[in-house]
Amino acid sequence: MRDDEFEWDDRKAARNLRHHAVSFELARLAFADPRAIDRLDLDESDEDRMLLTGLVGDVLLTICFTERGSRKRIISARRASQREKTEYSEQNT
């Protein structure tokens, strides 16, 4: 995983860190989880967004992102909800 595979808005990253206590630098590591699951984000948006749930250390994170060419643009990152934890567990057993 290379740093140039990811991009984000620095102001949004700072807000996300304050609100969810998850940095985008940490969040990008979830993409390296070979058992990570991704799905289309069905929230209404003017762009196609994806959700990825992956393990970073012992913390399960959910990242909202979009693909821009060969790069992933991180939009938000947070600890996975109970439903997302269950889905991750079921997909990986």
Descriptions of predicted regions:
Residues 1-93:
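Ribonuclease/tRNase effector modules and their secretory precursors
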